[in-house]
């Protein structure tokens, strides 16, 4: 693959007038290899070289009036775009900012900023429980371990270095006094690039926030092209932040504002353009995936399969519940955060033998930046188009109340129809791990998906809700056995019972049928 990329880049160079000597270096990074050296050589990764020349689809689009610049204009996009993106995504090391996470081991020191009072204090959790979740995130990555944890109080978590001078110095002394520490996980939503840089310089180790740790758990668990594309899109803010830091460092050395190869562009402008082109390609590819999803969704609608989306906090037992409801032995649930990153569909039957589609979704997590969730918006679109939602909760988890609030907050931001939210069934899973809770709400059911407790009641409630939400009715129809009526009903409805009346060659058929299908039946056979 590397030789192919090199040859393509070199061929392009033949038609380009270079004012600087270009030293080709085989790097996967978009910008980490870009260095202007004192000898005048400019080191550029091959993927970047390819973007400079007129053979790039980016420049072809600009030549022809920019009609390709709109992501929604899928009919004008050549398959070259998707092939290019898939080629770059074949290796998981998509960016230098996060590549080091997945290479080798890390001995992590978890630091949790504890806000004692004020609007920033978490009212639904405790510092100890939040540290426990942070540790679970660390253990989700291979060869990562937790060396120690520390809860450090802070009055101003939004300040530049999170902590006051005294606490920050204490923290610095602790980290430097333990050479076995190779990384610090600061348990906050997102650190600015400047804060991250200053902390790394002060402590001498890598510093991660929840965004980078969760993003790399996603990368480790991503197996499909769609998941990798979504993660590549979510990585772009990190790439841009690192670019600012690197450019600032080069400016101090007098190289950041130097024009490159006589192109009239500075280093920063080149990198910004490369990142923009990368973003365009990824979004184009995701639009293609989205179009395929819409096609599948349309086919389901034509066949009138009810769609039931299973959602909930990460590791709440969603996949285990789907396995229990469908009997699909091919499903292999894992006791792991973010084990599911792709939406998968699974056929099942309700007690009335009506076929339905259960949709397994990505798990939610508290304190995730909006743009990380937004990168998976195409995946979550299946939730919006559901006929019924089932919210699975790990009722045995000490933070189950906070987890519920986090899930409901995300659902609210998705802009779901209010009727879909009002009819959502809440499933309190893992009751085998605690004393049986007492439910007072009709829409709340207690189950153990692993051991099968409460599943029959759940199936009945799901059936009732689906019948109501999809406008299905139980109808008894008299059919002529010599006509195609019965075979039509088997195809277009859910046949419950057939009572043959041999004396007149007819049968009474009890079916579950939608209003639209019943209208078609009457039009065909009741003239």
From Swiss-Prot:
Binding locations of GTP: 312-319, 338-342, 360-363, 429-432, 448-450
Hflx-type G domain mapped to chain residues: 306-470
Database matches in PROSITE patterns: G_HFLX
Pfam families: GTP-bdg_M (PF16360), GTP-bdg_N (PF13167), MMR_HSR1 (PF01926)
Cofactor(s) essential for the protein: Mg(2+)
A single GO molecular function term of this UniProt record: metal ion binding
Signal peptide: none
Gene3D superfamilies: GTPase HflX, N-terminal domain, P-loop containing nucleotide triphosphate hydrolases
Residues the entry annotates as binding Mg(2+): 319, 340
Nucleotide-binding in keyword set: yes
Entry keyword Protein biosynthesis: no
Swiss-Prot/TrEMBL keywords: GTP-binding, Magnesium, Metal-binding, Nucleotide-binding
Family from the record: Belongs to the TRAFAC class OBG-HflX-like GTPase superfamily. HflX GTPase family.
Annotated protein name in UniProt: Putative GTP-binding protein 6
Source organism per UniProt: Xenopus laevis
Gene from which the chain derives: gtpbp6
């Amino acid at each position: 693959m590397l030789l192919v990329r090199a040859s393509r880049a070199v061929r392009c160079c033949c038609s380009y007038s270079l004012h600087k000597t270009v030293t080709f270096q085989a790097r996967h990074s978009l910008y980490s290899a870009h260095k202007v050296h004192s000898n005048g050589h400019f080191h550029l990764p091959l993927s970047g070289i390819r973007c400079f020349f007129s053979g790039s689809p980016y420049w072809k689009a600009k030549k022809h009036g920019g009609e390709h610049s709109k992501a929604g204009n899928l009919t004008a996009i050549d398959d070259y775009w998707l092939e290019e993106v898939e080629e770059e995504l074949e290796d998981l090391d998509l960016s230098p900012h996060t590549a080091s996470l997945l290479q080798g081991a890390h001995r992590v020191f978890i630091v949790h900023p504890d806000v004692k009072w004020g609007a920033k204090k978490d009212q639904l959790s405790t510092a100890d429980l939040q540290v426990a979740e942070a540790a679970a995130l660390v253990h989700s990555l291979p060869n990562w371990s937790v060396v120690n944890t520390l809860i450090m109080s802070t009055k101003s978590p939004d300040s530049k270095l999170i902590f006051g001078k005294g606490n920050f110095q204490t923290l610095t002394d602790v980290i430097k006094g333990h050479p076995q520490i190779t990384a610090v996980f600061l348990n906050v939503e997102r650190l600015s690039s400047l804060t991250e840089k200053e902390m790394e310089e002060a402590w001498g180790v890598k510093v991660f926030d929840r965004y980078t740790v969760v993003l790399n758990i996603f990368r480790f668990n991503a197996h499909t092209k769609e998941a990798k594309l979504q993660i590549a899109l979510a990585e772009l803010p990190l790439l841009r932040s690192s670019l600012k830091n690197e450019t600032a460092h080069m400016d101090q050395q007098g190289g950041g504002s130097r024009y490159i190869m006589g192109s009239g562009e500075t280093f920063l402008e080149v990198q910004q353009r490369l990142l923009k082109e990368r973003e365009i390609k990824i979004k184009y590819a995701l639009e293609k995936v989205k179009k395929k999803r819409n096609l599948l969704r349309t086919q389901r609608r034509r066949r009138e399969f009810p769609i039931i989306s299973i959602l909930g906090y990460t590791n709440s037992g969603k996949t285990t519940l789907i396995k229990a409801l469908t009997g699909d032995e091919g499903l292999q649930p894992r006791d792991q955060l973010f084990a599911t990153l792709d939406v998968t569909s699974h056929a099942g039957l309700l007690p009335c033998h009506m076929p339905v589609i259960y949709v397994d979704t990505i798990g939610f997590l508290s304190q995730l930046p909006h743009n990380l969730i937004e990168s998976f918006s195409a995946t979550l679109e299946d939730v919006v188009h559901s006929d019924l939602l089932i919210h699975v909760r790990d009722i045995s988890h000490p933070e189950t109340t906070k987890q519920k609030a986090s899930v409901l907050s995300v659902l609210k931001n998705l802009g779901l129809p209010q009727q879909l939210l009002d009819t959502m069934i809440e499933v309190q899973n893992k009751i085998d791990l605690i004393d049986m809770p007492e439910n007072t709400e009709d829409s709340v059911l207690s189950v153990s998906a692993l051991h099968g407790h409460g599943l029959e009641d759940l199936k009945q409630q799901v059936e009732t809700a689906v019948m109501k939400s999809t406008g299905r009715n139980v109808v008894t129809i008299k059919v002529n056995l010599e006509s195609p009526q019965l075979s039509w009903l088997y195809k277009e409805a859910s046949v419950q019972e057939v009572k043959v009346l041999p004396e007149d060659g007819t049968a009474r058929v009890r079916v579950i049928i939608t209003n639209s299908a019943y209208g078609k039946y009457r039009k065909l056979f009741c003239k």
